[in-house]
């Protein structure tokens, strides 16, 4: 999972993620917006979930972050899974609306984002 942090002309941090993980970048850009307290909450949840069967989620304005002890999912709130309308054996995946990654990879991006934001 590749990522890049940039500052726009006004100094706002923007995240760009590799193909298949774009929604994670959108989550940082739309929900985090340099709010390090939110990142603290996510990191605390990850520590609590490690080695357990529980899951945790944080719904935002545009995106919801869900995680368990192994995986992180970020999805657009407008995305609805209409299982009855899907053909048997078909999975719904929209790279503009849903991204999955491992918890450790996600926490590496969180740490790198935090470091970049603090370099002002």
Swiss-Prot record:
Name the record gives this protein: UPF0231 protein YacL
Family matches, as HAMAP family: UPF0231 (MF_01053)
Family the UniProt entry places it in: Belongs to the UPF0231 family.
């Amino acid at each position: 999972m590749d990522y890049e942090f940039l500052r726009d002309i006004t100094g706002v941090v923007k995240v760009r993620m590799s193909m298949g993980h774009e929604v994670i970048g959108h989550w940082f850009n739309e929900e985090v917006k340099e709010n390090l307290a939110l990142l603290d909450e996510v990191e605390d949840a990850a520590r609590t979930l490690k080695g357990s069967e529980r899951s945790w989620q944080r719904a935002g304005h545009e995106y919801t972050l869900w995680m368990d002890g192994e995986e992180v999912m970020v999805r657009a709130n407008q995305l609805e899974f209409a299982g009855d309308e899907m053909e048997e054996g078909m999975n719904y995946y929209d790279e503009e609306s849903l991204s999955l990654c491992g918890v450790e990879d996600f926490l590496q991006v969180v740490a790198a984002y935090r470091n970049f934001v603090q370099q002002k």
